[in-house]
Swiss-Prot record:
One of its GO terms (molecular function) is glutaminyl-tRNA synthase (glutamine-hydrolyzing) activity. GO terms for cellular component: glutamyl-tRNA(Gln) amidotransferase complex. The active site is at K76 (charge relay system), S151 (charge relay system), S175 (acyl-ester intermediate). Its EC number is 6.3.5.7. It catalyses: L-glutamyl-tRNA(Gln) + L-glutamine + ATP + H2O = L-glutaminyl-tRNA(Gln) + L-glutamate + ADP + phosphate + H(+). It holds the Pfam family Amidase. PANTHER family: GLUTAMYL-TRNA(GLN) AMIDOTRANSFERASE SUBUNIT A, TRANSAMIDASE. This is Glutamyl-tRNA(Gln) amidotransferase subunit A. Allows the formation of correctly charged Gln-tRNA(Gln) through the transamidation of misacylated Glu-tRNA(Gln) in organisms which lack glutaminyl-tRNA synthetase. The reaction takes place in the presence of glutamine and ATP through an activated gamma-phospho-Glu-tRNA(Gln). Heterotrimer of A, B and C subunits. It comes from the Bacteria. SUPFAM superfamilies: Amidase signature (AS) enzymes (SSF75304).
Length: 484
């Protein structure tokens, strides 16, 4: 049962091959057995899961099943879940129980999906390796010495290890695509505003976007259909029609114009990763697509621009955690200032504190123009690069990450090296366009992802292009040893 994809589970449930309760029990048993190995799930919710599965079985019996009814998943612990701890991977929110459901959680529950639990993540989504979590690092099922990527590392490891057929994630600078690449999964960052951010704990509000993680593009199409849509409770949500993403999955890629940016194949790209990605792009040429070199000249500024804008927005968003209203509160403060200082000092981890300090500095009176304003101006240039390129080509392809998964502890002392893990994904968030990562092979025995970038609200095309690759390859069907 655990080998089936979301689409296969949904079809089997509707055909009566097994019940939602049976499939839910099977995944809960795998979480019990394998979670101690990966540390992917920090809050299992077996009671709620079985109740939701029974309700789904009733819907199926009544002939009221939708395309996702009865299918289990895990939610990244950044999404508020009513009555269930929502920690965001931080000591600051270790005791926080959300009083309401995030829109994404509510929509998928309404679609009949079954929440198995909450997935581990980098603290406040700040990290590329899932090593900043208060609950300890997550291990990559493909190699337990390796990181799963971040910040949605728990979501990625849970799906790769077959603890769940699907997961939600969030992507601020690559946090869905990079862990999907490092764990051999399919992961989609939708267009900014496509998926509601209501109830999704904020890191950098102009960059954050929720999205699905699963093994196939067909599964992502089903999940995005359940997640996407306008929400009046999120001022950045866009009122744009939600198509049936599964309808166009099988379109031919003959004549598709694929742009390959020379900037994504320069210094810093592991030669083996490069070979795998080039071979994947070659598959499209064989399928009748047209490949042309393009240039995205300003994307080389993505890392410095991102590390001004994202920390600036984070320092503002995280100012709400003060030890007064909710979250961690220090013991016996001597006065209000001591309460603020110690609650924040003890409640936040090192990486979060580093980014708050960087962001506060970038926003401070004497430096605002030199840093924050300048970064926003360069961000516009990056966006213009994509707009120009996507007028000439249909999609853009390149590596998702410059290397395969690195070992746990290998980059913790070198923040800049860690930040460069997202060098190919950051520009997509800065521009707000959608990006997809699909499994394209292995290098040094660890998975490699192919990144496919499209125009605003063109997720259907990305999923179609990814699906066509998965029809002629079987990288998405590989299983990590010990998790069969």
């Amino acid at each position: 049962m655990h080998e089936k994809t979301v689409a296969e589970i949904a079809a089997a449930l509707r055909a009566g091959e097994f019940s939602s309760r049976e499939v839910t029990e099977a995944f809960l048993a795998r979480i019990d057995a394998l979670n101690p190995v990966t540390n992917a799930v920090i809050t299992p919710t077996p009671e709620q899961a079985l109740a939701a599965a029974d309700a789904a079985d009733q819907r199926i019996a009544a002939g009221e099943a939708g395309p996702l009814t009865g299918v289990p998943l895990v939610h990244k612990d950044i999404f508020c879940t009513q009555g269930v701890r929502t920690s965001c991977g931080s000591r600051m929110l270790d005791n926080f129980t959300a009083p309401y459901d995030a829109t994404v959680v509510g929509k998928l529950a309404d679609a009949g999906m079954v929440m198995l639990g909450k997935a581990n993540m980098d603290e406040f989504a700040m990290g590329s390796s899932n090593e900043t979590s208060y609950y300890g690092p997550v291990k990559n099922p493909w190699d337990l010495d390796a990181v799963p990527g971040g910040s949605s590392g728990g979501s990625a490891a849970a799906v790769a290890g077959r603890l769940a057929p699907a997961a939600t994630g969030t992507d601020t600078g690559g946090s869905i695509r990079q862990p999907a690449a490092l764990c051999g999964l399919s992961g989609l960052k939708p267009t900014y505003g496509r998926v509601s951010r209501y109830g999704m704990i904020a890191f950098a509000s102009s960059l954050d976007q929720g999205g699905p993680m699963a093994r196939t593009c067909e599964d992502l199409a089903l999940l995005l259909g359940g997640m996407a849509g306008f929400d009046t409770r999120d001022s950045t949500s866009v009122d744009h029609v939600v198509p049936d993403y599964t309808e166009t999955l099988n379109r031919s890629v003959k004549g598709l114009k694929i742009g390959v940016p020379k900037e994504f194949f320069g210094e810093g790209l592991d030669p083996e990763v490069r070979r795998v990605v080039e071979a994947a792009i070659e598959v499209y040429r064989e399928e009748g697509a047209e490949i042309r070199e393009i240039s995205l000249p300003n994307t080389r500024h993505s890392v410095p621009v991102y590390y001004v804008i994202a920390p600036a927005e984070a320092s503002s968003n995280l100012s709400r955690y003060d030890g007064v209203r909710y979250g961690y509160r220090c013991e016996d403060p001597s006065d209000l200032e001591d309460l603020y200082k110690r609650s924040r000092g003890e409640g936040f981890g090192e990486e979060v504190k580093r980014r708050i300090l960087v962001g506060t500095y970038a926003l401070s009176a004497g430096y605002y123009d030199a840093y924050y304003l300048k970064a926003q101006q360069v961000r516009r240039l990056i966006r213009d690069d994509f707009t120009r390129a996507l007028q000439a080509v249909d999609v853009i392809m390149g590596p998702t990450s410059p290397t395969v998964a690195f070992n746990i502890g290998e980059r913790t002392d070198d923040p800049v090296q860690m930040y460069l893990s997202d060098v190919y994904t950051l520009a997509v968030n800065l521009a707000g366009v959608p990006g997809l990562s699909i499994p394209a092979g292995f290098a040094q025995g660890r998975p490699v992802g192919l990144q496919i970038i499209g125009d605003y609200f063109d997720e259907a095309r990305l999923l179609n292009v990814g699906h066509k690759y998965q029809q002629v390859t079987d990288w998405h069907r590989q299983v990590p040893q010990g998790f069969e």
